[in-house]
Amino acid sequence: MIVRDILEQIVAGQDLSRKETETVFAAIMAGAWTPAQIGALLMGLRMKGQRVEELVGATQALRACMTRVEVSTDHLLDTCGTGGDALSTFNISTVSAVVAAAGGARVAKHGNRSMVSRSGSADVLEAAGLRMDMSPAEVADSIERIGIGFLFAPAHHGAMRYAVGPRKELAIRSLFNLMGPLSNPAGAPHQVLGVYAERWLIPMAEAARELGSRHVLVVHGHDGLDEISLSGPSDIAELKDGMISRSRIQPEDFGLSSAPLATLQIDSVAAALAAAEEVLQNRPGPRRDVVLLNAGAALYAADVVPDMAVGVVVARAVLKSGAAWDKWQALLGRTSQG
């Protein structure tokens, strides 16, 4: 496959097939494309408009060369989203993952350091004391023994290194932002997947279906949050039993009060860690409430509860009982829970 021909095809506004995209991204991850060529491809795809078939093909290439974590996928959940909302909230999906684990989900939390916000999942977990150099076997043991483990993206997606430079220099969202959440190294088939733009709700659900996911909630808040929002409505595209449906929810649907986005924002990793721990210690307020929403959705996506409303009830209970705090301590290796 000649690089020039692929770029000419994209410049002409012609979509790549799933197989063509898989071949292109496999070549990129093998180091066969130069940084300039990778940058041209990413910009060309963005300008043309990125299609589901292209996203699926690229993700298949990424999955083919990732370092896997071998665990049972029963009720195995991820809460990794696209990121890129640039709203600098505390780590809602990470805290929600811990609460979901305390509520009975098995969690393979996939994540990375922050690109545009104040604190990514890896940033806050590392600040809390979690090692980022855990082997796949150690991560698998954490999932099986504790019920939650963290999969640090660079440790499992080494082939992505060839695209790091072009992505940083372009400094725009690209297909890679969408591929990452669809490439859980443990193969988690259950997911709450936040997206940075409403237009990606259905395409991401369609891609997840093509890639074999079981139950996925693709979510986007009207305030731009790539989580279920507390400041107003959130849209959801749900993949379940092979079917995709759309819905809109509000905090009041679950007995919670709306609150301004500013109540969830932080300005440093230290502030993000403090926010996470105050929620896990069940301190009332908007931060706890937004976690109740997202953890409730996570428990539903994991098929631990019959609907999101019950999930919110369970999330509230594990925070109140201290089970969520205990799960956090176990994840960090401070207790021997198992």
UniProtKB/Swiss-Prot annotation:
One of its GO terms (cellular component) is cytosol. Its EC number is 2.4.2.18. 5-phospho-alpha-D-ribose 1-diphosphate binds at residues 81, 84-85, 89, 91-94, 109-117, 121. Binds 2 magnesium ions per monomer. InterPro entries: Anthranilate_Pribosyl_Tfrase, Glycosyl_Trfase_fam3, Glycosyl_Trfase_fam3_N_dom, Glycosyl_Trfase_fam3_N_dom_sf, Nuc_phospho_transferase. Anthranilate 2 binds at residue 167. Pathway: Amino-acid biosynthesis; L-tryptophan biosynthesis; L-tryptophan from chorismate: step 2/5. Gene3D superfamilies: Nucleoside phosphorylase/phosphoribosyltransferase catalytic domain, Transferase, Pyrimidine Nucleoside Phosphorylase, Chain C. Anthranilate 1 binds at residues 81, 112. It catalyses: N-(5-phospho-beta-D-ribosyl)anthranilate + diphosphate = 5-phospho-alpha-D-ribose 1-diphosphate + anthranilate. Its cofactor is Mg(2+). Signal peptide: none annotated. GO terms for molecular function: anthranilate phosphoribosyltransferase activity; magnesium ion binding. GO terms for biological process: L-tryptophan biosynthetic process. Keywords: Amino-acid biosynthesis, Aromatic amino acid biosynthesis, Glycosyltransferase, Magnesium, Metal-binding, Transferase, Tryptophan biosynthesis. Mg(2+) 2 binds at residues 226-227. It is an enzyme of class 2 (transferase). Mg(2+) 1 binds at residues 93, 227. Homodimer. Catalyzes the transfer of the phosphoribosyl group of 5-phosphorylribose-1-pyrophosphate (PRPP) to anthranilate to yield N-(5'-phosphoribosyl)-anthranilate (PRA). This is Anthranilate phosphoribosyltransferase. It comes from Acidithiobacillus ferrooxidans (strain ATCC 23270 / DSM 14882 / CIP 104768 / NCIMB 8455). The gene is trpD.
